[in-house]
From Swiss-Prot:
It comes from Edwardsiella piscicida. GO terms for molecular function: exoribonuclease II activity; RNA binding. Keywords: Cytoplasm, Exonuclease, Hydrolase, Nuclease, RNA-binding. The gene is rnb. GO terms for cellular component: cytosol. This is Exoribonuclease 2. Residues 563-645 form the S1 motif domain.
Amino acid sequence: MFQDNPLLAQLKQQLHSQTPRVEGVVKGTDKGFGFLEVDAQKSYFIPPPQMKKVMHGDRVRAAVQVDKEREIAEPEELLEPFLTRFVGRIQKKENDERLSIIPDHSLLKDAIGCRPARGLDRAFRQGDWVLAEMRRHPLKGDRSFFAEITAFITDGSDHFAPWWVTLTRHDLARSAPQWQAGTLLEEGLAREDLCALPFVTIDSASTEDMDDALHVRENADGSLCLTIAIADPTAYVSADSPLDAEARHRAFTTYLPGFNIPMLPRDLSDDLCSLREGQRRPVLACEVTLDADGSLRDDIRFFSGWIESKAKLVYDRVSDWLEGRGDWQPPSDDIAAQIRLLHRVANARTQWRQQHALVFRDRPDYRFVLDDHGDVTDIVAEPRRVANRIVEECMITANVCAALVLRERLGFGIYNVHTGFDPALVEQAVSLLNANDVAANAEALLTLDGFCTLRRHLDSLPSTFLDSRIRRFQTFAEISTEPGPHFGLGLEAYATWTSPIRKYGDMVNHRLLKALIAGAPATRPDPAMTLQLAERRRQNRMAERDVGDWLYARFLKDKVNAPTPFNAEIIDISRGGMRVRLLENGAVAFIPASFIHAVRDEMVCSQENGTLQVKGSVVYRQGDTVPVTLSEVRLDTRSLIARPFSA
């Protein structure tokens, strides 16, 4: 009798319209239920039956119901799926042709039904790594989740899976681009012949793509004339060529533990353009004079040229020689003189930047030592030594010169820009600083001078607590076609051109500088390019991190409950515990709050304050160094679990 009853339909519509609705992101758990996080303060419980309609990370609209005085979210509409294109592993039962896939994500454990895309003719096996795309979702009216396999990555037993899986996940190339070997382009540039000068390169022993060579001349007045010669790939790659389009798409050389995937063909990056010892190479060069205090004179000159590197020097050998250690000697008196002059350049520029700009704190680089099978045999901490600083100071000098010339003569280029504190958050930064006895005001902090003054003070403190806390109020560095300051470096402008073999933005700046040299028109870069460059930079960094996490898990699985603790720096404190970085090897581990103190109600983990309190007393602060032991290594999620060390 109630079928098609208009009054009942009206009542249902009224109840539906009166039910409150919220939008948020689904957070899954490993216990079947989940939460809908609306913002940082508010979340709603999602019971297991409702969780079957969604997956972790989905953005949904949900109805809020009250059950036994508890607010419950019932997802109704999918706003943005978490999974679209994803990597996973094939699940296949014996004597069953049906396939399913488990996404490679720590909070996605349920198998999803799947089938190969049309034309993908392969007999998939248990454990195979594949690329897939979601095709069905319960909140889209489908009965269940379903995916389509779009590509095979590698089999489950491949020891090099970390590399292939990660490159596929981040949509990065697996091999170098190809090209038909060409000749030098006719660019209408007169190249100065500098082959007689003792230029040197300083790199790691294994480096093949050497893109910078250095030469210093001392003038009669004691000033130093520095020439930075940079490899010239745009002498072979024209702006409208397919190879240039491929380089723009890749944007960067991808550096992963054990190997790299170049932005340009290896014939170019590792041979024709690489500034190899004893080989005549085309370069784009910058010449500038440094006064004794490290300041740059206004005689900056860019030009095209030919050089012949007279020595391939290695960081550690040069550092040892300058520090009076080891038995290595420069191959000639000319090379020894160049090393000494370059050391003077670095010292002068470092001193100038300490007073007028900013110098980063030295942190070691961590290098994975791999055998032929991709197994990690060791992880080596490589401190930033004097030879590294020589190259760093020369490259920063060169990039400052390019930034100034492009700004003054063109008004555009590819600039690295960092504007310091976010104006919307700067008052919070002031409050934090004042609460920690550091005088500050918002107006000053938003200026380059004010920012630099604060950074120098923070760097002088014995603890990194304030330094690490203050960073969350800062903006991220950006890539821009417009000149702008780089607060992080303490410089009024910064435009890189010193790595054109590895960075497409540097190739663009090369072409702009060449246009100035030739007196030719220069084309303003498309602003959309900067978004693509920034996204590619993010993908490359994530790929390096992901492979690193995988290798750390493999290497450290045998170190669980080892008797000797690791010293670790606390890098983050959250509601659930602390993240720490092992100083010996750079690995990041998580310490659950339950491992710190047994009574949860007696503990306050404050991300806001960067502190962890037990019974009202601060026990740990962000930036502290603490001894820890590894409690668990989870190979499936590539995560490390640690606990505070107790003797």
